[in-house]
């Protein structure tokens, strides 16, 4: 049964060409918002906390600080409203899910930049 679900996802779900990113990376997600008849593009820039799931049901969580309040947003990878994703900075973290990042403030909340080869 799982192979049938995977086959349908691979064949019929549209794949977007999105860059590869992982936990610790700082990315900007540009997505479309519909307000009545108008549509506008809004962006959300923050640190990737986690990537979860596989295939077409994959999601990722981004966290940013808005003043002194932390804001997290979960995006499905195949959300039709996503226009593009930019990687601003590659971060070097040891874990795939950096939930400990929620409790850090100030200079402790910095992520070391990864060395690109």
Swiss-Prot record:
Signal peptide limits: none
Gene Ontology, cellular component aspect: cytosolic large ribosomal subunit
GO biological process terms on file: translation
Keyword line: Ribonucleoprotein, Ribosomal protein
Gene Ontology molecular-function annotations: structural constituent of ribosome
Listed InterPro entries: Ribosomal_bL19, Ribosomal_bL19_sf, Translation_prot_SH3-like_sf
Source superkingdom: Bacteria
Role noted for this protein: This protein is located at the 30S-50S ribosomal subunit interface and may play a role in the structure and function of the aminoacyl-tRNA binding site.
Protein family: Belongs to the bacterial ribosomal protein bL19 family.
PANTHER family on file: LARGE RIBOSOMAL SUBUNIT PROTEIN BL19M, RIBOSOMAL PROTEIN L19
Protein name, UniProt field: Large ribosomal subunit protein bL19
Protein source organism: Christiangramia forsetii (strain DSM 17595 / CGMCC 1.15422 / KT0803) (Gramella forsetii)
Gene field: rplS
């Amino acid at each position: 049964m799982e192979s049938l679900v995977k086959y349908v996802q691979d064949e019929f779900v549209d794949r977007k060409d999105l860059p590869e990113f992982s936990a610790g990376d700082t990315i900007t997600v540009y997505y479309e918002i519909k307000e009545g008849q108008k549509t506008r593009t809004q962006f959300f820039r923050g640190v990737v906390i986690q990537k979860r799931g596989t295939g077409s049901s994959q999601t990722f969580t981004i966290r940013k600080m808005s003043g002194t309040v932390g804001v997290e947003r979960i995006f499905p990878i195949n959300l039709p409203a996503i226009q593009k994703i930019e990687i601003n900075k590659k971060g070097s973290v040891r874990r795939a899910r950096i939930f400990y990042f929620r409790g850090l403030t100030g200079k402790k909340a910095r992520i070391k930049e990864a060395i690109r080869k």
